[in-house]
Amino acid sequence: GRVRRLILANTSSFMGPPSAWDARIALVRERGMAPLAQASVERWFTTAFAAAGQAAIAPIAAMLQATDAQGYAGCCAAIRDMDMRRTAALIDTLTLVIGGTQDPATPPSHSEALAQAIGGVRLVMLEAAHLANVEQPDAFGRAVEDFLA
């Protein structure tokens, strides 16, 4: 195939329930990005990192705040409707799955389920929440470099 290696980081084959995404879409359409930006940042980083890593978090919070609400709602709809639980098993490419041990958005069980569905996967769990590449950049980079080497 055209893809020789695949890296799936802090993701899932299913991000249900749809009702949660519908509520998020309604909220952003009614009130804009401000309420979601803070809530997202709180979920995307561990408490310890949030307390010590404001320099890394501030630009991400600003980016969320500046995101077009309609565009964000569209992304939420795409995530709501995505269900790869049955088709993930069709992936036959060398795959690295990276997850965060403290990720409430895509918990470790989601990373493990992806790895099991795909088979022959290298699974790396980092001490991080949802943005493991920001919270653990060195460990994340090493995992990627080792996989691609």
Which residues make up each language-model segment?
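Core-facing hydrophobic residues within beta-strands of well-ordered domains
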Residues: 2-4, 118-121
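Catalytic active-site module of serine/aspartate enzymes centered on a nucleophile-bearing elbow/loop
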Residues: 119-149
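Flexible "cap/lid" loop of the alpha/beta hydrolase fold
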Residues: 1-37, 43-44
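Hydrophobic, aromatic-rich cap/lid helix
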Residues: 20, 38-39, 57-86
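Short beta-strand/loop motif that positions the catalytic acidic residue
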Residues: 91, 97-99, 103
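Short, surface-exposed alpha-helical segments at coil->helix boundaries
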Residues: 18, 22, 54-58, 108-112
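Hydrophobic "lid"/C-terminal helical patch
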Residues: 40, 76-79, 114, 140, ...
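Short alpha-helix in the alpha/beta-hydrolase fold that links the catalytic acid
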Residues: 93, 107-116
